[in-house]
Design a protein with these regions (language model features):
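Structured catalytic core of nucleotide-sugar glycosyltransferases
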Residues: 1-119
Length: 119
């Protein structure tokens, strides 16, 4: 069993303006809850500078942030699958890059999993 508790996969397509803020929210949430975590950004060949932002976050947070650079645009589902293949956490969560998911809601998902013993 992995020592990483939570893998958070974020498919990225033109998320240059949101992914730093999203990572900061995830980082704060996981540290507050004392979760050992990893964030896997999967860049799906958008047309903005998302990959440069991912590289910068990865440099600041080695061992926590992983960037996957897809060779072309494969679509959101395939980007998620690429992230799942890289994930090492006991639990895997997917989040969109555009801040529509609040990292605090991760607790609701984990509580539901524990109360129902869901996969």
């Amino acid at each position: 069993m992995s020592d990483v508790y939570l893998s958070i996969i974020i498919p990225v397509y033109n998320g240059e303006t949101t992914i730093q803020s999203l990572f900061n929210q995830i980082d704060d949430f996981c540290k507050k809850n004392q979760f050992k975590f990893e964030v896997i950004f999967v860049w799906d060949c958008g047309i903005d500078n998302s990959w440069k932002v991912i590289e910068a976050i990865q440099l600041k947070h080695p061992g926590v942030v992983c960037g996957i650079h897809l060779s072309r645009n494969f679509g959101q589902h395939n980007a998620i699958l690429a992230g799942i293949n890289k994930a090492s956490g006991n639990y895997i969560i997917t989040m969109d890059e555009d801040l529509q998911h609040d990292p605090k809601d991760i607790l609701l998902l984990l509580d539901k999993q524990k109360s129902t013993n869901a996969d």
